[in-house]
Amino acid sequence: MADNLRKLVSTESLRSMQDKLENWLREYNNNSCDQNLNYCLELIEQVAKVQGQLFGILTTAAQEGGHYDGVETIKSRLLPWLEASFTAASLGKPVDSKIPSLQDTFDKERQKESVIRDRNIHQLDADLNTTRNQLNQVQDDLAETEKTLEETKNRSAISLLAAEEEINQLRKQLKCLQAQEESRHRPPEHRSSEKRGSERRRVEPRGADRCGAAQRKAEEICDYEKQLRTLKDEIAVLSAEKSVLQGRSTRSRSPSPASCSRSRSHSHSRSRSHSHSRSGSHSRSHSRNHSRSRSASPSTAVSGVRSPSPNRAKLSSVARKAALLSRFSDAYSQARLDAQCLLRRCIDKAETVQRIIYIATVEAFHVAKMAFRHFKIRVRKSLTPSYAGSNDFEDAVLDYIICHLDLYDSQSSVNDVIRAMNVNPKISFPPEVDFCLLSNFIQEICCIAFAMQTLDPPLDIAFGADGEIFNDCKYRRSYDSDFTAPLVFYHVWPALMENDCVIMKGEAVTRRGAFWNSVRSVTRCRSRSLSPICPRSRVGLSTISRSRSPSPIRCGLPRF
């Protein structure tokens, strides 16, 4: 670069150019137009040569600066000059220094971008702070909710403990009063006949006083017993509600219905053992003895069974009835819908799905009642030697069944229900799909029905037939029903009965002409292919036309 600059200085082109300009200025008026043009062109050529040399020096200097040096200088000096020169040349105007350069434009755009960027950053910071505040608020609300829940749990536990403590105190007072009453009414063992004769007159007024005191004490004892029964009923109901809530929370974590039913049965037995301390210890010992083997015989625990108190079955029946009603309601609202979802994967028709679930529920109740009868017969045979001539034999049998509900073989009942459904002519079902899909639902219904037979009086479902007159006291109409139709087209869910009283309404679909449609559907239906549980090769006509001993509620249902 230094050599090129030295050559440019040595040629003295700029000095000669200055001389030519001065000569041209002196002779401009005397020269012709051609001569002035020649002078101008010579100067332009000379300036172009000098510019070429200067651009060469500029290129060399820029190369010596590397990739990044000199970039800002070129942008700030060369590019604006070129822009102004080309603009002036295109417009035919001289170069004006007041025209904004590219550098100014770049600076303005850079400032605008920085302002926009700062504005966006501030907006993002504000949004981030708002989100953080909301998150902190949610965390505070969550902490407060947890504290409130913990306080509620503590209060409920304290109230339960206080109730149990009060019950224990009442029991102690009752025992003391009974002991005093027995000691007062106990006859003296060694009394001479002389003292009896001499003290008769003294004993008569004392006996009258004692009778009055005994009556007052008896009234107090009756009051204490009433209070005790009331507290036991309240504790039983609270324990049942607690077990129901625990069962719902465990089902929301998606366990199987079988495990839910077992957990509920254990929770009922625990609440029952709290309300009855004497028999509770025996029931826990029986459950520990039988937990090792589900198929153990009832005779293994005959020696541990004791006669229950008169109020025991009544008190426990209140809690168990509330829990079973809640389980039956949950089966309708949750387990039934889950079973419908499973069947709708294979069946498109909603009517067929609802018929299948209703028939499964009816068959499950029938099989569970039969299993309860057989189980009760076995318990009677096992307990007969130890309760010969006892008046509390039936209470002892029922108490043993209540304490050992886990001995019920629900899987065998599920297999029986599936066999009965396979030969039911009302179900038109694809042969490639099996009713084993409903095993969990059927098992839950069987466990509920079996436990309902231990109540006094037992609970059962109402008899329902297609084409019957719709009873508003037993059923509610489904959403897709014809609300003016008087006949039932088909049943969705059975009604729950206690003797002749309706406890829970069922659900039915009503349509006009339901009776004739149901008759046609029965005549057109083909027989079902049997479940893999019962192979075809072993099932003959005797299995299909088998007879059962129907319950009074199911005596009108046809059997095929």
Curated annotation (Swiss-Prot):
> Taxonomically, which superkingdom?
Eukaryota
Keywords of this entry: Coiled coil, Cytoplasm, Lipid-binding, Membrane, Mitochondrion, Mitochondrion outer membrane, Phosphoprotein
Q: Which GO terms describe its molecular function?
A: cardiolipin binding
Q: Coiled-coil ranges per the record?
A: 118-186, 223-248
User: What function does this protein fulfil?
Assistant: Key regulator of mitochondrial quality that mediates the repairing or degradation of unhealthy mitochondria in response to mitochondrial damage. Mediator of mitochondrial protein catabolic process (also named MALM) by mediating the degradation of damaged proteins inside mitochondria by promoting the accumulation in the mitochondrial matrix of hydrolases that are characteristic of the lysosomal lumen.
Region Interaction with YWHAG/14-3-3 protein gamma, annotated ranges = 1-294
Put simply, this protein is called: Mitochondria-eating protein
Q: Could you tell me where the Low complexity compositional bias lies?
A: 248-262
Q: Name one GO cellular component term.
A: mitochondrion
Q: Which residues carry this modification: Phosphoserine?
A: S13, S85, S156, S159, S307, S309, S531
> Is Nucleus one of the keywords UniProt gives this record?
no
Q: Where is this region: Disordered?
A: 178-217, 243-316
Q: Where is the composition biased (Polar residues)?
A: 300-310
Origin organism is: Sus scrofa (Pig)
Q: According to the UniProt entry, which residue ranges have a biased composition of type Basic residues?
A: 263-293
Q: Can you say where in the cell this protein is located?
A: Cytoplasm, Cytosol; Mitochondrion outer membrane; Mitochondrion matrix
Q: Which PANTHER family match?
A: MITOCHONDRIA-EATING PROTEIN, MITOCHONDRIA-EATING PROTEIN-RELATED
Q: Which family does it belong to?
A: Belongs to the MIEAP family.
